[in-house]
């Protein structure tokens, strides 16, 4: 009887120690577009804004499971101005800013834009590698808009184009989240240590 109690106490001690050592970096996920701004729209009516939110919510589950605190710039179909997204992340005390997007319906590959701030390019390359062979990495200045709002975040910031805007199954969304969560968490651990 006493042996199982000893085992239970050891297990509880280990769990408490692991919990105390869990990462505490705050990561803000920014599901792009929303509300009056649908983003790209596929021929079947699939809206990029909806895909972005669903992908960000799924990614959060995996980052939280890895011990990270995660915030959002939006959690429903609302419009949030670009400048407010960065201001929200700053108010939340974010250490990393990850904008979640899907490209035009005709896009052929996923990719990642990165801000000019230290750590951003490394984070972008890490996430692009997790997205698979052929994923591109570009500075934010190379976007068709000339400059991206992620540049206004003072730390590592990326904009991930998870692929074309089209219907996406829950299984595919989960696979994408699983693929990028660990590399993001590993980067956050190193960056915030």
Annotated model-derived regions:
Residues 25-45:
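Short glycine-rich His-centered loop
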Residues 2-7, 13-26, 50-193:
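Active-site-proximal helix/loop segments of hydrolytic enzymes
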């Amino acid at each position: 009887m006493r042996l199982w109690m000893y085992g239970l106490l050891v297990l509880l001690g280990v769990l408490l120690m692991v919990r105390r050592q869990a990462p505490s970096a705050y990561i803000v996920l920014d599901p792009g577009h929303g509300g009056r701004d649908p983003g790209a729209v596929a021929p079947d009516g699939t809206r990029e804004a909806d895909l972005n939110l669903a992908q960000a919510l799924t990614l959060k589950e995996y980052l939280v499971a890895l011990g990270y605190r995660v915030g959002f710039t939006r959690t429903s179909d609302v419009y949030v101005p670009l400048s407010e997204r960065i201001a929200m992340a700053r108010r939340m005390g974010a250490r990393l800013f990850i904008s979640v997007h899907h490209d035009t319906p005709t896009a052929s590959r996923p990719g990642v834009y990165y801000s000019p701030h230290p750590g951003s390019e490394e984070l972008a390359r890490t996430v692009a590698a997790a997205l698979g062979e052929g994923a591109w990495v570009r500075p934010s200045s190379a976007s068709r808009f000339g400059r991206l709002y992620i540049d206004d975040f003072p730390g590592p910031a990326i904009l991930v184009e998870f692929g074309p805007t089209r219907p996406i199954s829950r299984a595919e969304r989960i696979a994408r989240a699983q693929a990028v969560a660990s590399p993001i968490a590993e980067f956050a651990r190193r960056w915030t240590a």
